Amino acid sequence: SAAISLKEKAPERSVLVLERGLFPSGASTRNAGFACFGSLTEILSDLKKTGPDKTLAVVEKRLKGLEKLRQRLGDTAMDYQPVGGYELIFDKELPALAELEKANELLQHLHPEGTYTNRPGLVKTLGFNPEKVKSVVFNPHEGHVHTGKMMQALLKLAQEKGIEVRTGAEVTAIDNSAGQVTVQVKEPVRGTVGFQAQKVAVCTNAFSETLLPGCQIVPGRGQVILTTPIPGLPWQGAFHFDEGYYYFRNVGNRVLFGGGRNLAFEAETTTVLQDNQQIQQELQRLLREVIIPGQTFGIEQQWSGIMGFTDDKQPIVKKLTDRMVLGFACNGMGVALATTIGEEVALLLADKT
């Protein structure tokens, strides 16, 4: 996204993207594909932690990013489905319903017709366990995308704009001296290869700490499972619960379900891509007991992805030097925020001062 935005602002620039893996391998191709900007309980939690100004600012960036992404790629290319967003309300979240209008008022200038509505009747309609789920909050402004198609469309657009993309190019060091920046890349034959540039953007999100110690972007691993097909799956849409720590959606008639990082914060603060059996088992339990009770299903796939977080949930975009820019920390909202952050990174790179 940053490279595309830079090329749009400065088409005369030669732009190279160095990608560590054969495919983008942190969260880009491993995210759950949610085109969302914040559930009710997540917004209320952010209001308490960071206040209305910061909460509103990041929601606006998420919405702006989703709008720009859809304009840039088109809904068909990334299989965007405007199916709406839903939040499951359990006993402990019932007090949040009393603050629903508070959240709507905060977002009123973004959605004058309203953002969140309490729909308790959906618990039965959508087949959730009524002993566990007490209500459902509906948000008509969200949806989901096909992550693989989205990344293919971004890569195709980048190549059409003349951007060179090198995969399997793991950056091991960045030397900012002698009037230019040298980026060292691991190479299996020669050991390392150096690329020289006038300016460099570090957009490695959760992996930024490796190249830039002290950058204040903390990794957070997300666990995901995908079920076998479920005949007659009674719902479609993008669903969340527990302040956004759990999320699920339909993929056709399968259920993609992820989250649970809050069960093991310390263990999941890592860049190691592997399964956490404690969380994977909890995801399966919640599927059986809450989300699709009474349904027979198997687990077809399971994986993890690495996200980047900051203490105040605000993205980081800043100049490190005249020739280096740091961007990202999507805080679990990469689909929504990446385009906006990329635009801000490009503005700093294109700055001739």
Model-derived segments and their meaning:
Residues 130-198:
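Helical element adjacent to the flavin cofactor pocket in flavoenzyme catalytic cores
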Residues 7-30:
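Glycine-rich FAD pyrophosphate-binding loop
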Residues 233-320:
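Active-site lid/adjacent beta-loop-alpha segment flanking the redox-cofactor pocket in flavoenzymes
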Residues 185-235:
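Central helical "cap/lid" subdomain
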Residues 38, 90, 203-204:
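Short, well-ordered coil/turn residues at beta-beta hairpins
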Residues 26, 30-60:
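Glycine-rich active-site loop/strand segments that organize a redox cofactor
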Residues 41-47, 71-156, 161:
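Flavin (FAD/FMN) cofactor-binding and adjacent substrate-gating region
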Residues 141, 289-353:
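C-terminal catalytic lobe of FAD-dependent flavoproteins
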